[in-house]
Each structure stands twice: as C-alpha cells, then as structure tokens.
C-alpha cells in the first residue's frame, strides 16, 4: 500500500520476512512534483537536483561513500551520459522510435548504469518527472538493446545483455 501526501509518496516494503529487507521508503517531492530526496526509515539516502526539468545530479548519503554523486547530461529529452564522483561514465544511445510507453526502460532494467536514476522506482506505479526518455534506449556504453515492434510502434520484445523480455499490453 502506498501513502500519498502533498509532498511525498511512501511505501512499506516487506521482502523475505526479515530485516534488512523490511523498511519504510519515501520519495520526498518539491512543489512541482519532482523527487528531491529518497528516504529509508526516515534517513535520507539520496538527494536529487534538476536543471530544465531533468535530473542533473544524484547524491548518495551514507557513512561509507559520502559525498558520492552522479551527474547527468540530457539532449532532446534523452539521457546521454551519466558520470560519477570518480569520473566513471556511461554513455547512452537511442532508437529513432518515440517512447510511447511513458516509462524509462533503463531504470532497474538490464543492470545498466547504476540501476537507473531512481533505483527504487519499482515501488511506484510510474516514473517521476525528469527520468523518462523521449525515445527507446538503444545502448548503454557497448551493451546494445534490440526491439521488435508492433504495427503501432510499441515494443513487443526487448533483447539486451543477459535479458530477453516479451511485452504484453492489457
């Protein structure tokens, strides 16, 4: 069950019946509906900054890596590069097909990047503003993603590194 307030979306996560897989997760939103931080059990894990409506920086807050962060570069609504504190980077390419699904296929898919900008977005019914690309992803660095499409341009199959997904629409 999700709990919604004016400035947050929360969920109680319960997996495997034991700690550390049981916790309360919350996305804190600004007045425009953008995620500004992600909390677990009331402790801030990540903070987000935006530029022109897109995530420009994600900072991880924990005792081991603080301040560890990722920066993001966007073009025409598509994430083109992410770079971390240690100058490691991932570059992305896209198909020429418009993204009709209104989801980010990179987030928590294929094990690419750092599991997406919003790594815990799987808790939520949709992606947040500033994380959905305009076109379908085609690659992350040298890991290519291939699609089969139906007559209306929706993907019916996605094949990527160690992945083969058949998509069904209801």
Regions found by a protein language model. Name each.
Residues 1-170:
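Buried hydrophobic residues that stabilize the cores of well-folded domains
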């Amino acid at each position: 069950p999700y709990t919604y307030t004016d400035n947050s979306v929360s969920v109680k996560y319960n997996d495997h019946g034991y700690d550390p897989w049981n916790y309360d997760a919350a996305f804190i939103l600004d007045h425009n509906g953008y995620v500004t931080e992600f909390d677990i059990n009331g402790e801030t894990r990540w903070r987000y900054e935006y530029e022109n409506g897109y995530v420009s920086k994600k900072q991880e807050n924990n005792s081991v890596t603080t301040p560890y962060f990722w920066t993001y570069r966007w073009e025409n609504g598509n994430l083109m590069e992410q770079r971390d504190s240690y100058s490691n980077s991932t570059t992305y390419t896209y198909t020429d097909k418009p993204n009709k699904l209104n989801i980010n296929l990179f987030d928590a898919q294929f094990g690419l990047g750092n599991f997406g900008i919003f790594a815990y977005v799987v808790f939520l019914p949709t992606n947040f503003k500033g994380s959905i690309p305009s076109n379908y992803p085609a690659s992350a660095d040298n890991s290519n993603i291939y699609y089969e499409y139906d007559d209306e341009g929706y993907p019916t199959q996605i094949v990527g590194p160690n992945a083969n997904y058949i998509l069904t629409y209801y």
